[in-house]
Amino acid sequence: MNKLIFTLAGLIAPLVMSSPLPQPAELLATNTVIAVYEKTVDRPCMHLTSLCPDRCNHAKKLATFRVITNENYKRTGKYGDDKSEPGSLVYVDMLHDEPGQSENVRKLIAELKPGDAVRITVDHYYVTGNCKYPVRPVTIERVEKPANIPPAKAEAPAMDIMPLAR
């Protein structure tokens, strides 16, 4: 019986990882920004659980984008993400796709060079089915680089202590 359960779990796991947005889901906020790609950072596992480092999925490969302008922001729920201010950073995980996110996002980021400008739209959903959790799928498209690029914020947090919403 246990072998059957593990076999079924192994067959279903890839479907869950690259799945569409779970339903029902409530849209809490939408944030569209023009940003400049800076770099990709490897963030190792911090070894905080018994599953670490082999089976925990804590390690991240983060693409870092600096926000230039905020084109569109709409908060439809009480707990939606805040508006991204010019000079702030947006991180996109390159190792794991969010549910509802196109697989082309990682392909496009892999082609980017530091200084390339993109339009990033982050939709903040809250899944309200049997399990309740946030989902933030990202869409990215190339745009022309704007002339006025704000400097980096001085109070940017250190990369190794910044929490990720996952």
What does each model-found stretch correspond to?
Residues 5-19:
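Hydrophobic h-region of N-terminal signal peptides that target proteins for export
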Residues 21-38, 42, 149-166:
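N-terminal low-complexity, Pro/Thr/Ser-rich intrinsically disordered segments
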Residues 27-76:
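Structural detector for short beta-strands of small beta-barrel domains
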Residues 70-89:
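Acidic Ser/Thr/Pro-rich low-complexity disordered segments
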Residues 88-104:
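Short, structured beta-strand/loop micro-motifs enriched in basic residues and often containing a Trp
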Residues 100-121:
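Short nucleic-acid-contacting surface segments enriched for D/E, G, S/T with interspersed K/R
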Residues 124-156:
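OB-fold/S1-family single-stranded nucleic acid-binding modules
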